[in-house]
């Protein structure tokens, strides 16, 4: 007997999609350019930095043919700042730290006075499209990244949990203080998971009008892991709400019948 397929995308499938994220490497050996489905990869010439898909970077790292430069957010200082936002900032006690802006959107500090509009891209045939993760450079290394913290706080990309876990497993020697990085990632995951669980409490309004949970800033793996739990809660609340609505309608019908009977008795007495 075959088990039913899980609803939605599974965690292994999410990790597979995260391997398409672009990361920065420093090649140790020369390698000719590659033509991939996601686009061409420039020839690898040491020590020139190159952005390649994560799966290719992990392959070259295992073969000791390249080193991976961690993205700015995967630094202990960046993760500590994000953890402070998640736990100490009153504006985010029941919300998640803001995600990085999409192409064409203003930065976090500019959103108060600039209109948020995404900038489209175009295919070679001229078709317009809007790029989304994993096809955005949210995990590439940047020069002078920490100087930018003074003007722009660090943010977690959409595939932060998957990318961080894979880099810690395969390229821990390329990260700054991997033990502390692993601990901060674990704390962030626990804090954000607790927010998701606590946010489900407001889903009791799903039985009535206007219920919902804001998921702005939630990562792909967090959505995949919480989908089954949240869906089960919503289904249960919907059934409870349906039974409550049925009971309310029955009470309303009984009250209407009693009023009709009382009025009928009154009319009978008046006729008598």
UniProtKB/Swiss-Prot annotation:
The keyword Nucleus applies. InterPro entries: GINS_A, GINS_bundle-like_dom_sf, GINS_Psf2, PSF2_N. Keywords: Chromosome partition, DNA replication, Nucleus. Residues 245-261 have a biased composition (Basic and acidic residues). It holds the Pfam family Sld5. The keyword Lipid metabolism does not apply. One of its GO terms (cellular component) is GINS complex. One of its GO terms (biological process) is DNA replication. It is found in: Nucleus. Residues 262-272 have a biased composition (Acidic residues). Residues 93-128, 244-272 are annotated as: Disordered. Belongs to the GINS2/PSF2 family. The GINS complex plays an essential role in the initiation of DNA replication. Has a role in chromosome segregation. Component of the GINS complex which is a heterotetramer of sld5, psf1, psf2 and psf3. This is DNA replication complex GINS protein psf2.
């Amino acid at each position: 007997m075959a088990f039913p397929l899980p609803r939605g995308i599974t965690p292994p499938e999410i990790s597979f999609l995260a391997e398409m994220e672009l990361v920065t490497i420093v090649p140790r050996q020369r390698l000719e350019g590659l033509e991939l489905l996601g686009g061409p990869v420039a020839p690898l010439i040491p020590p020139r930095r190159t952005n390649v898909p994560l799966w290719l970077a992990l392959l070259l790292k295992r073969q000791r043919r390249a080193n991976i430069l961690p993205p700015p957010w995967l630094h202990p200082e960046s993760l500590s700042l994000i953890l402070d936002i998640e736990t100490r900032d009153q504006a985010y006690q029941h919300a998640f730290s803001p995600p990085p802006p999409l192409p064409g959107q203003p930065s976090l500090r500019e959103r108060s006075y600039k209109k948020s509009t995404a900038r489209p891209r175009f295919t070679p045939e001229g078709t317009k499209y809007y790029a989304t993760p994993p096809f955005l450079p949210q995990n590439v290394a940047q020069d002078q990244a920490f100087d930018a913290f003074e003007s722009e706080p660090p943010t977690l990309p959409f595939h932060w949990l998957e990318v961080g876990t894979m880099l810690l497993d395969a390229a821990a020697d390329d990260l700054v203080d991997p033990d502390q990085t692993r601990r901060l990632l674990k704390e962030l995951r626990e804090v954000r998971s607790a927010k998701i669980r606590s946010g489900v409490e407001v889903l009791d309004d799903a039985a009535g009008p206007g219920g919902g949970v804001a998921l702005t800033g939630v990562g792909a793996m967090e959505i995949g892991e919480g989908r089954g739990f949240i869906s089960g809660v919503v289904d249960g609340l919907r059934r409870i709400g349906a039974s409550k609505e049925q009971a309310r309608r029955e009470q309303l019908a009984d009250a209407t019948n009693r009023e009709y009977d009382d009025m009928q008795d009154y009319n009978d007495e008046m006729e008598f």
